[in-house]
């Protein structure tokens, strides 16, 4: 909340969602820390998941970096701000887009390609590990007959700074909390 409040003067509209408003505080913190650069890409859609054909992000996720670039110039000062539009849905297209976006930085195409391969593999491993952990947790909860709630919402609801402590409130009532991205694959 403090982070949000200290950049409230840079938020152009009350109609922006809370996570978008929170970005302003993060950017101010980064600029004040005098980081080498700020990397905040515009992502139109993510990788295809299962059989879903709707992998588009909301307009705020897609374009908010552009708003930050134009509304926070005074805050960022001379800190380089990178906000390329990236095709995160397709790793093959991602490499050339990153090479173009990072042309001013000392990264070779092979380094970028290796980084994308490593990151993609790690993300898939993380998802697989999470699915397996959820599967084991569900089995234990069923065996122990623990009341359980699947807390569904936007991905940012997992952020403790945004979710208002809802998961903790639920667990304080003796119930378990599972996330929709953890249980969704179990129904397949």
Predicted region positions:
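An N-terminal assembly and electron-transfer interface module characteristic of large anaerobic redox
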Residues: 1-188
